[in-house]
């Protein structure tokens, strides 16, 4: 995992104004856990693709407690291919990335129980729960969920298909 900028990411091209709004209408991307890992781990199989996409496409991005905790859990797990020694060692890596001016932190302010956001009848497997939650969070914030997962099911989230962004 990238330590102290072993592979620098593109500089931020936008900043927040005094109200916390972004200075242009470009989309904000909520990164799923795999995108965060790919961006910060230069040994990850998708690192080059993620980095190129980030540099070429992203003006503003977001994370939430779920994606941050998922990153910490996975990259510090001993069976991860390039593990850090502990979650405590992974925290500063992620904190440095999240300190960028193009980052937003979103509180968990959507629920899969909210029928206005989610059609629970379309949640057909446990594998859809986290993806649907992140997609609903992106929709709530008028953003897009950035993922490598081409099979991500969007039908449970109202507006989900338009909010999904698959990194090619």
Region locations from a protein language model:
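Short, well-structured N-terminal submotif of metal-dependent ribonuclease cores
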Residues: 1-63, 75-92
């Amino acid at each position: 995992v990238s330590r102290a900028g072993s592979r620098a990411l593109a500089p931020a091209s936008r900043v927040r104004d005094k109200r916390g709004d972004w200075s242009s209408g470009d989309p904000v991307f909520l990164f799923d856990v795999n995108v965060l890992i790919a961006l910060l781990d230069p040994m990850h199989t998708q690192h080059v693709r993620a980095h190129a996409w980030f540099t070429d496409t992203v003006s503003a991005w977001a994370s939430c407690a779920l994606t941050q905790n998922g990153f910490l859990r996975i990259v510090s797990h001993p069976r991860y291919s390039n593990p850090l020694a502990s979650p405590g060692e992974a925290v500063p890596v992620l904190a440095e990335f999240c300190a960028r001016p193009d980052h937003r932190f979103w509180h968990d302010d959507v629920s899969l129980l909210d029928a206005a956001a989610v059609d629970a009848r379309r949640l057909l497997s446990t594998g859809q729960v986290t993806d649907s939650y992140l997609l609903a969070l992106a929709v709530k914030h008028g953003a897009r969920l950035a993922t490598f997962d081409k099979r991500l099911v969007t039908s449970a989230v109202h507006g989900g298909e338009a909010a999904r962004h698959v990194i090619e």
